[in-house]
Amino acid sequence: TRQATLFPYTTLFRSPEVDNEIDETNAIKETEYVSAIDFAVLDSQNPDVVAWIQIPGTQINYPVVQGKDNDYYLHRDLNGQKSTAGTIFLDYADRADFSSLHNVLYGHHMKNGSMFKDISRYKDQGYFDQHSEIIVYTPEREIHLKALAAVCTSPDAIRRKTEFASGEEFASYIQQMTAGASTSAPIEGTIVRLY
């Protein structure tokens, strides 16, 4: 079976611990990151919640969980109840803090427009260009991503690769994964993470 795959990326990201601000005396003041998402409430509902994903202008605005495997949340909702739609989830092999070089998120393409249905719309270059900003909120930081390419693929293990021996291997992997993209954007800077 074929699926739509979107490859967003980051070129720079903030320190997970603090943001820096300049005060009136021009001294750097460290302030703690405060998430726009109440992760304490989400954690009390389900401790498997690791993030929240939002793509402005789309229906994608969901919590992200990570299970012990890639099967549990495929057909279970956030509360662990059976659900055709499942829950958006991070590959079990990725690091929960999104520090893997390639962070793989899964979600169903639901006919009612929910979950990752809007990913299939990225095949249109105009839609791709208008919805290229992707935000991942974690308890430690806010990650702003830019869409790199949309590819119609079959799910296979190569697309799940999360560890790389070198920067060259990672760059080669990016080229391989985005080859044949139906839509894409120019790369701005050096890619440090792929999602």
Regions flagged by a language model, labelled:
Residues T1, T5-L12:
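Short, small-residue-biased leader/transition segments that mark boundaries at the very start
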